[in-house]
């Protein structure tokens, strides 16, 4: 192999190594970002504001959204984590205390409320009779407000979950 070809190969390898290290650094930072934040005791004000905006925008479409969970303490999170493991019930979370966006006031869970007042988690329900799933209409609104939907996750689907990191 001549010198220019060797130089090109070495530069390509260095570029790929830099790319790999950048990715690893980004992933490490993302996973540890919550640990660096001070622990709040309520929803972040922007998350609360956007949760209220979500409810209002959904109501304008004839959909009644109920926020079933917001801020959750580390202790409450650990109790949920025990469910299906050391306590009776189904597993409802894979996050221990300190690992959930709920613990930092950055996540909400929602459900739909029918006209009779019952709370449902039915992703196919079309209470406003427009031919679309009310659940997915709410998700669409949430995404425009900056929320990430747990239903888009690859590993564990958490359909009622919405989270955000305010700018």
Swiss-Prot record:
MF terms in GO: peptidase activity
GO biological process: cell wall organization
Record GO cellular component, one term: plasma membrane
pH dependence: Optimum pH is 6.5.
UniProt keywords, alphabetically: Cell membrane, Cell wall biogenesis/degradation, Hydrolase, Membrane, Signal
Subcellular location: Cell membrane
EC number(s) recorded for this UniProt protein: 3.4.-.-
Domain of life of the source: Bacteria
Signal sequence range: 1-26
Keyword hit for Transmembrane helix: no
Temperature-activity note from the record: Optimum temperature is 37 degrees Celsius.
Chief site of localization: membrane
Family: Belongs to the peptidase M15C family.
Function: Cleaves the linkage of the L-alanine-D-glutamic acid of B.subtilis cell wall.
Descriptive protein name: Peptidoglycan L-alanyl-D-glutamate endopeptidase CwlK
């Amino acid at each position: 192999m001549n010198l220019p070809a060797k130089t090109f190969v070495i530069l390509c390898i260095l570029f790929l190594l830099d790319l790999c290290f950048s990715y690893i650094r980004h992933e490490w930072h993302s996973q540890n970002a919550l640990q660096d934040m001070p622990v709040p005791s309520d929803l972040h004000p922007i998350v609360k504001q956007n949760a209220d905006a979500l409810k209002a925008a959904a109501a304008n479409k004839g959909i009644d959204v109920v926020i079933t969970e917001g801020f959750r303490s580390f202790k409450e999170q650990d109790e949920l984590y025990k469910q299906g493991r050391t306590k009776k019930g189904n597993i409802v979370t894979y996050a221990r205390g300190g690992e959930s966006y709920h613990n930092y006031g950055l996540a909400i869970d929602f459900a739909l409320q029918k006209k009779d007042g019952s709370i449902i988690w039915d992703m196919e329900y079309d209470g406003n009779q427009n031919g679309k799933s009310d659940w997915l209409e709410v998700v669409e609104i949430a995404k425009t407000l900056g929320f990430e939907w747990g239903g888009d996750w690859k590993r564990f689907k958490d359909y009622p979950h919405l989270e955000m990191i305010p700018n």
